[in-house]
C-alpha cells in the first residue's frame, strides 16, 4: 500500500513551533488540482471537438481553432487527464489534506465546476477512499483512541436541510465565538464502524435533491456537505494535552449552468438561479482573498455556503479544491471560468493549526505552578543574578575605558598625520611654484581638471594611494580624456604663441640694428652680424607662417600632424635667440674697449648732446615694458641706473641745442678763464657718464628681455613635446598597445563599476539642473557602459558639474548685482520642462494603445477616475533619481512616446542629439545642451 503523499513544499510558507499548551500554526495555500473528463455520449453525438490537452501533469493548454492566436496555458499543482482514475485524483492531492484531520487539523475537500463535468462522480470516489484510509490509520495507530461523529446537510435554494433527519425542516445558522458558524439542531451521529459510516453516507446521497436537465440526467440541485468530526486521544495520558479534535468537510457543490444550455424553466430555472448566485459569492470570496489586500471586505455572509465554509476559506483549515472541466469545444467558455476560479484559489492562504483539547484540571494546575514560581522569584531574587549584573557592569566599564583610550590614541595619530600632511602640502606648493611651472602651464593649457572634481575610482582606496600613484592617475585621466582634435588645436595655439615670440625677437634685433647703424655703437663686424641675424629670423618667420584661422582635423590627421611637427626645426628660434645673446655680449665688450680709446673721447667732445635717451626711445620702451615681456623695465634696473634716469629726465634731447646754452659756452670759450675751462670739463664728464649709463641700461634691458624670450620659447617647446607625446599615446591606445600606465590602471579600475557610479551622478545632476527629460532619455538609451562611452560620460558629467556650479554661483550672488537673472534662469528651465511634459502627454494616445495605457496608469498609481490622467502619468516620469528601476522605466516610456524605438537604423554615438530629433518635432527644449547654452547666454 502506498504511503500518504505529502503536500508540496511550495505550498507551505511558515511554521511555528509548539507551545507548552498551545498549537502549531501553519500558513499554507489552498491545494488546487484539475480533472478533465472524457467526452460523454451527448458530445459524441454532436461531433463535438476536444479543445483542451494536458502536455504534462501540471499544465493544461487550450487549443485555439484560430491558428493565428497563440495557445493559452494554465498551470496548477496537479492536472489529471481523462484517462486517470478517481483513486489517482485522490492520492495526487486530496489524501494528505484528508489525513491531516487525524492529527488535529481541520480539513476541507470540495469539487467545483460546471454542470455535467463530473463533480459528484469524483466526490463519491474521494469519500470512499477517505473512509478507507481513516479506518486503516485507526487500525495501525493502536496507542490512540478515536471517536468519529458524522453530520450531513444540503443547501437547497438557500435553505439548510439536515440530510440525516429531514423532519427538522429548515435550519438556522448561528455564530459561536469559539467554534465559528454552527448549524442549529443539526443531527450528529456517532460512528460505530466503517460499515456504519458508509451506510450513513449512502443515506445522505439518497436524500439529496437531484433533477434532470438537458445536459445531465441526474443533475445535483443543491450543495451537499458531509462533516466528519474526529476526536483522538492517547490511551495513556501524559502531560496537559489530552486529545486532538478536528473536522473533515467533504463538499459536493452543484454545478454552474446556463439557462439556454439546460433549457430550464419553472422550478429548474429557480434552482439554477440560486446555485449560480451562491457560486458567484464563492468566486467573489476567493478573489478577495487572493488579492492579498487585508483591508478589503470579504462577503462571507452573502451566501449560506460561504458562511458555513468560512473557516475553510482563509481560516483555520487545510483546503483542497478539485476543479472538474469538460474538454468539449462547446463548453469552452464555462471551462475558462472554472480555470480562472482555480487560478485565484491558488493564491488564497489558510492559517491551519492543531486543535488540542486540554484537561481543565491539569491546565489549571500547570498555570498555578507557573504563577507560584514567578511570585517566588519576585519575592527573593537570587544573589547570583545580582553578582552577574555587577560583573557585567564592571566588564562594560572596562570596555568603555579601553575604547576611550583607543579613541585618544587614534586622535593623536590623526593629528600627527594631519600635521605631516600640511607640511608636505606646503613643501609641494613651494616646490611646484619653482620647479613644476611647465607642467602646471601644460595643465592650464589643456584645460583638463586634475583636482578632486574628477571622478574618483572606487577600485583603489584613496587613503592607500601615494602621491606618485595619484600623479599617475592624473596623467592617465588627462591622456584618456583628451580628444585628439583638442590636442591638435592646442599644438596650433602653441605655434601661434611661438610666432608672436619670434616677432618680438625680430623687433628687438631691429631696434639693436637701428641703434648700431645710426649711432655707430660697436664695430662694423658686429653691425653686419646683427643685420645677418635679422634677415635669417625674417626668413624663418616666412617659412613658418601660419594662417590666422586654425583648421582642426579629425582623429585620422594625427599622423600628419606628428610628421609635420617632427619635420620642423622647433629649436630654430631658440638658436637664433642664442645668437642674439652672443651679439649683445660682443657689443658690450666692444663698447667697453671703445670707451678707453682717444677717438671715443674726441667723438664725445664733438657731440655735445646725447644721440638718444631711454626716456625718448618709444620703440625700446614699448618693447621692454610691453605686456608681452615677462620682466618689466623697473625690475631690471639697478639703483645707479635709476639715479641716472632721474637726473637725466629734465635734460632736453632735441635736434638743435638751446640758444642760451650755446651763447654761454661761446662767451666762456672767448674769455678763456680757468673757471669756464673747469665748468666745461665738468659738463663733458657728466655727459660722458650719462651716455655710458644710458647705453649700458639699454643693452642690459635688451639682454634681460632676450633671456626672458629664451625661457618662454623653452617652455613652449616643452608644452609642444608633451602634447606630441599625448597624441602618440592616444594612437598607441587605438592600435591596442598597452603602456605602463594602462597596465597598472586597468588592473585597478573596473569600468562597469565606474560607469554605474558616473551614471548615477549624471542622473542626479539632471534632476538638480532641470535638464530636458528627452535629453536624459537619449543619453540613457544610447550610452549603456561600452568602454568607448567613457569620453561621452566624462563630457556630460563635466557639463552638468559646471552647470550646477554656475547656477549655485548665481543663487549665491547679490541680488543687487544680478537683478532677476537667477530667477529667470531657473524659471525658464522649469517652464521648458513643463512644456516638454505637456508635449509628451499629447503623444500618449497616439503612441500607446488603450490596454497599454491602462496598464501603465495602474502601474504608476494614476487614479482610475479623474481629469488629465495623461498629464498625471507624464508628471510621474523622471522624478526619482535615486531609484534606478524608476529611471529605466521612465526612459523606456519616453523613448516610445518620442519614437526612439521606432527607427530601425543604427544610431551613431558621434551624432548624439542629431539623429533622434525628427524634423517635425524640433522644439527649443529638444535641442539638448543647445537650449541650456542659450538659456545661460553662453
Curated annotation (Swiss-Prot):
Q: Which residues form a coiled coil?
A: 357-431, 555-590
TM helices/strands, residue ranges: none
Q: Where does ATP bind?
A: 113-120
Of the GO CC terms on this record, one is: phragmoplast
Q: Where is the composition biased (Basic and acidic residues)?
A: 658-669
User: Which cell locations does it reside in?
Assistant: Cytoplasm, Cytoskeleton, Phragmoplast
State any GO BP term from the record: cytokinesis by cell plate formation
Name under which the protein is recorded: Kinesin-like protein KIN-7B
Q: Which organism is it from?
A: Arabidopsis thaliana (Mouse-ear cress)
Amino acid at each position: 500500500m502506498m504511503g500518504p503523499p505529502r503536500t508540496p513544499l511550495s505550498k507551505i510558507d511558515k511554521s511555528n513551533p509548539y507551545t507548552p499548551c498551545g498549537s502549531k500554526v501553519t500558513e499554507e495555500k489552498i491545494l488546487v488540482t484539475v480533472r478533465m473528463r472524457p467526452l460523454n455520449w451527448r458530445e459524441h453525438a454532436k461531433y463535438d471537438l476536444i479543445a483542451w490537452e494536458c502536455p504534462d501533469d501540471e499544465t493544461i493548454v487550450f487549443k485555439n481553432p484560430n491558428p493565428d492566436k497563440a495557445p493559452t496555458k494554465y498551470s496548477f499543482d496537479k492536472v489529471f487527464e481523462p484517462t486517470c482514475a478517481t483513486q489517482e485524483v485522490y492520492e495526487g492531492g486530496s489524501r494528505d489534506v484528508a489525513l491531516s484531520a487525524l492529527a488535529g487539523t481541520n480539513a476541507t475537500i470540495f469539487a467545483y465546476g460546471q454542470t455535467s463535468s463530473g463533480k459528484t462522480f469524483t466526490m463519491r470516489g474521494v469519500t470512499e477512499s477517505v473512509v478507507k484510509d481513516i479506518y486503516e490509520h485507526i487500525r495501525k495507530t493502536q496507542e490512540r483512541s478515536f471517536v468519529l461523529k458524522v453530520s450531513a446537510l444540503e443547501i437547497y435554494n438557500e435553505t439548510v436541510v439536515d440530510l440525516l433527519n429531514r423532519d427538522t425542516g429548515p435550519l438556522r445558522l448561528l455564530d459561536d465565538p469559539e467554534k465559528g458558524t454552527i448549524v442549529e439542531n443539526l443531527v450528529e451521529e456517532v460512528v460505530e464502524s466503517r460499515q456504519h459510516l458508509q451506510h450513513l453516507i449512502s443515506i445522505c446521497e439518497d436524500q439529496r435533491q437531484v433533477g434532470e436537465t438537458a445536459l445531465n440526467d441526474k443533475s445535483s440541485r443543491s450543495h451537499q456537505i458531509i462533516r466528519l468530526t474526529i476526536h483522538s486521544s492517547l490511551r495513556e495520558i501524559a502531560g496537559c494535552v489530552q486529545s486532538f479534535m478536528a473536522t473533515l468537510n467533504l463538499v459536493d457543490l452543484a454545478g454552474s449552468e446556463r439557462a439556454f444550455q439546460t433549457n430550464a424553466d419553472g422550478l429548474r430555472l429557480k434552482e439554477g438561479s440560486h446555485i449560480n448566485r451562491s457560486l458567484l459569492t464563492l468566486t467573489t470570496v476567493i478573489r478577495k482573498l487572493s488579492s492579498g489586500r487585508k483591508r478589503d471586505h470579504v462577503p462571507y455572509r452573502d451566501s449560506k455556503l460561504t458562511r458555513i465554509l468560512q473557516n475553510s476559506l482563509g481560516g483555520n483549515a487545510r483546503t483542497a479544491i478539485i476543479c472538474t472541466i469538460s474538454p468539449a469545444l462547446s463548453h469552452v467558455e464555462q471551462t475558462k471560468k472554472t480555470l480562472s476560479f482555480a487560478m485565484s484559489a491558488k493564491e488564497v492562504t489558510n492559517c491551519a493549526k492543531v486543535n488540542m483539547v486540554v484537561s481543565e484540571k491539569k491546565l489549571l494546575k500547570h498555570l498555578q505552578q507557573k504563577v507560584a514560581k514567578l511570585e517566588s522569584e519576585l519575592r527573593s531574587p537570587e544573589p547570583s543574578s545580582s553578582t552577574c549584573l555587577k560583573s557585567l557592569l564592571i566588564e562594560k566599564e572596562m570596555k568603555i575605558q579601553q575604547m576611550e583610550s583607543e579613541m585618544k590614541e587614534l586622535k593623536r595619530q590623526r593629528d600627527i598625520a594631519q600635521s605631516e600632511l600640511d607640511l608636505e602640502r606646503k613643501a609641494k606648493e613651494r616646490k611646484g611654484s619653482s620647479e613644476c611651472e611647465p607642467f602646471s602651464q601644460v595643465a592650464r593649457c589643456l584645460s583638463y581638471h586634475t583636482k578632486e572634481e574628477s571622478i574618483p575610482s572606487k577600485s583603489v582606496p584613496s587613503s592607500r594611494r601615494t602621491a606618485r600613484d595619484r600623479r599617475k592617475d592624473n596623467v592617465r585621466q588627462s591622456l584618456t580624456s583628451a580628444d585628439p582634435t583638442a590636442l591638435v588645436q592646442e599644438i596650433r595655439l602653441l605655434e601661434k604663441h611661438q610666432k608672436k615670440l619670434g616677432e618680438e625677437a625680430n623687433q628687438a634685433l631691429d631696434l639693436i640694428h637701428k641703434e648700431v647703424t645710426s649711432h655707430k655703437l660697436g664695430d662694423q663686424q658686429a653691425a653686419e652680424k646683427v643685420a645677418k641675424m635679422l634677415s635669417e629670423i625674417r626668413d624663418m618667420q616666412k617659412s613658418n607662417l601660419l594662417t590666422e584661422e586654425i583648421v582642426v582635423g579629425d582623429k585620422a590627421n594625427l599622423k600628419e600632424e606628428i610628421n609635420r611637427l617632427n619635420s620642423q626645426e622647433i629649436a630654430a628660434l631658440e638658436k637664433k635667440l642664442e645668437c642674439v645673446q652672443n651679439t649683445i655680449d660682443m657689443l658690450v665688450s666692444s663698447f667697453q674697449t671703445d670707451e678707453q680709446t682717444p677717438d671715443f673721447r674726441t667723438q664725445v667732445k664733438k657731440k655735445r648732446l646725447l644721440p638718444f635717451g631711454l626716456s625718448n626711445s618709444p620703440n625700446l620702451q614699448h618693447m621692454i615694458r610691453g605686456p608681452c615681456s615677462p620682466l618689466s623695465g623697473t625690475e631690471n634696473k639697478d639703483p645707479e641706473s635709476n639715479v641716472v634716469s632721474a637726473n637725466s629726465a629734465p635734460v632736453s634731447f632735441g635736434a638743435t641745442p638751446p640758444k642760451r646754452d650755446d651763447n654761454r659756452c661761446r662767451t666762456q670759450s672767448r674769455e678763456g678763464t680757468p673757471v669756464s675751462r673747469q665748468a666745461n670739463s665738468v659738463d663733458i664728464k657728466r655727459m660722458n657718464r650719462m651716455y655710458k649709463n644710458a647705453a649700458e641700461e639699454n643693452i642690459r634691458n635688451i639682454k634681460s628681455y632676450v633671456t626672458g624670450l629664451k625661457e618662454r620659447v623653452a617652455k613652449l617647446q616643452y608644452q609642444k613635446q608633451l602634447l606630441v607625446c599625448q597624441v602618440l599615446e592616444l594612437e598607441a591606445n587605438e592600435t591596442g598597445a598597452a603602456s605602463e600606465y594602462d597596465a597598472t590602471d586597468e588592473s585597478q579600475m573596473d569600468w562597469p563599476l565606474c560607469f554605474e557610479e558616473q551614471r548615477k551622478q549624471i542622473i542626479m545632476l539632471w534632476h538638480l539642473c532641470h535638464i530636458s527629460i528627452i535629453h536624459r532619455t537619449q543619453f540613457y538609451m544610447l550610452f549603456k557602459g561600452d568602454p568607448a562611452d567613457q569620453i561621452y560620460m566624462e563630457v556630460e558629467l563635466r557639463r552638468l558639474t559646471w552647470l550646477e556650479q554656475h547656477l549655485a554661483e548665481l543663487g549665491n550672488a547679490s541680488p543687487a548685482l544680478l537683478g532677476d537673472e537667477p530667477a529667470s534662469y531657473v524659471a525658464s528651465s522649469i517652464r521648458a520642462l513643463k512644456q516638454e511634459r505637456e508635449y509628451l502627454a499629447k503623444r500618449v494616445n497616439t503612441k500607446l494603445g488603450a490596454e497599454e495605457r491602462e496598464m501603465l496608469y495602474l502601474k504608476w498609481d494614476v487614479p482610475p477616475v479623474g481629469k488629465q490622467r495623461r498629464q498625471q502619468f507624464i508628471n510621474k516620469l523622471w522624478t526619482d533619481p535615486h531609484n534606478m528601476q524608476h529611471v529605466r522605466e521612465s526612459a523606456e516610456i519616453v523613448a516610445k512616446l518620442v519614437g526612439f524605438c521606432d527607427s530601425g537604423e543604427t544610431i551613431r554615438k558621434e551624432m548624439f542629439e542629431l539623429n533622434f530629433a525628427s524634423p517635425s518635432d524640433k522644439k527649443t527644449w529638444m535641442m539638448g545642451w543647445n537650449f541650456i547654452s542659450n538659456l545661460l547666454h553662453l
